[in-house]
């Protein structure tokens, strides 16, 4: 089974 690529992205934190 091919797993989706889960990569930690630098999401902009909602201040």
Curated annotation (Swiss-Prot):
Which BP terms from GO are recorded?
defense response to Gram-negative bacterium; innate immune response
State the UniProt keywords alphabetically.
Answer: Antibiotic, Antimicrobial, Immunity, Innate immunity
| Top-level lineage group | Eukaryota
Question: Does this entry carry the keyword Endoplasmic reticulum?
Answer: no
* A GO CC term assigned to this protein in UniProt: extracellular region
Up-regulation conditions: By bacterial infection.
Function field: Antibacterial peptide active against Gram-negative bacteria.
This chain's protein is named: Metalnikowin-2A
Lineage, top ranks: Eukaryota, Metazoa, Ecdysozoa, Arthropoda, Hexapoda
């Amino acid at each position: 089974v091919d797993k989706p690529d889960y990569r930690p992205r630098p999401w902009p934190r909602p201040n």
